[in-house]
């Protein structure tokens, strides 16, 4: 799948093992995918040692908005340090102001703590008034990529705006489409947006573990691997957009 990137969201050690396959280019390590992804535990970060060179930790201390106070920032600094100590390749960060713009001061602070790590700007960008302007800010901050759904609930719904974001970014920064990305819509997304990097949980399709006590059903590793295989097959189709 030369020229295309597949990133998989992982919130368990079982899925870490699944994503060791070379079909997965990058891992977004997190917890609580049902809440949009929060910071993974220190234990999970350490257990990523076998795939640490392609693992990037989500740094999000709580659910809800991305307007952070001083104590939230303290937590994020510590979590960035934990990701570095675990030998991970990068971190996924974001922060906004009450006015729904990127919080440049907070981002600069976090990036300084993450010196030497690859930086991804997460879907905070989808909550902003002007995501296109945020692309320029991210470039100035030295961020490597932006994960976005194009301001919509799913990347497919946001495809038109994703195309605008890709055009604005050019070759300055990678735009990665995420939220609801499946083997069924990969071709359409690539064709409509020009984007060549995709983020997926790999859990679509409804196959989950039993949850008789209401403690939270999760996608089985076998199901996620099956979906990874499907997405990889799509990338390799002769008619997939170049």
Annotated model-derived regions:
Residues 13-15, 33-56, 70-75, 95-115, ...:
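Active-site-adjacent beta->alpha loops and helix N-cap segments on the catalytic face
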Residues 11-22, 65-82, 119, 126-141, ...:
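Catalytic cores of alpha/beta
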Residues 1-27, 32-39:
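N-terminal pre-domain/capping segments
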């Amino acid at each position: 799948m030369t020229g295309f990137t597949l990133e998989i969201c992982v919130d368990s050690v079982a899925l870490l093992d699944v994503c060791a396959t070379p079909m997965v280019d990058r891992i977004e390590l997190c917890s609580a995918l049902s809440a949009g992804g929060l910071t993974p535990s220190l234990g999970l970060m350490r257990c990523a040692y076998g795939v640490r060179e392609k693992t990037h930790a989500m740094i999000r201390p709580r659910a809800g908005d991305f307007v952070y106070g001083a104590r939230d920032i303290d937590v994020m600094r510590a979590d960035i340090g934990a990701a570095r100590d675990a030998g991970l390749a990068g971190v996924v960060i974001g922060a906004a102001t009450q006015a729904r713009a990127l919080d440049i001061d907070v981002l600069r602070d976090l990036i300084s703590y993450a010196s030497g790590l690859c930086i991804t700007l997460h879907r905070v960008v989808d909550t902003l008034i002007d995501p296109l302007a945020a692309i320029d800010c991210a470039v100035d901050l030295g961020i490597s990529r932006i994960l976005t759904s194009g301001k919509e609930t799913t990347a497919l719904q946001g495809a038109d705006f994703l195309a605008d974001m890709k055009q604005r970014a050019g070759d300055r920064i990678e735009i990665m489409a995420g939220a609801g990305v499946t083997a069924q819509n990969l071709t359409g997304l690539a064709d409509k947006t020009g984007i060549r990097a995709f983020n997926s949980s790999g859990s679509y399709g409804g196959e989950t573990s039993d949850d008789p006590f209401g403690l939270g059903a999760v996608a089985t590793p076998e199901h996620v691997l099956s979906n990874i295989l499907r997405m990889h097959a799509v990338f390799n189709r002769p008619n997939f957009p170049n």
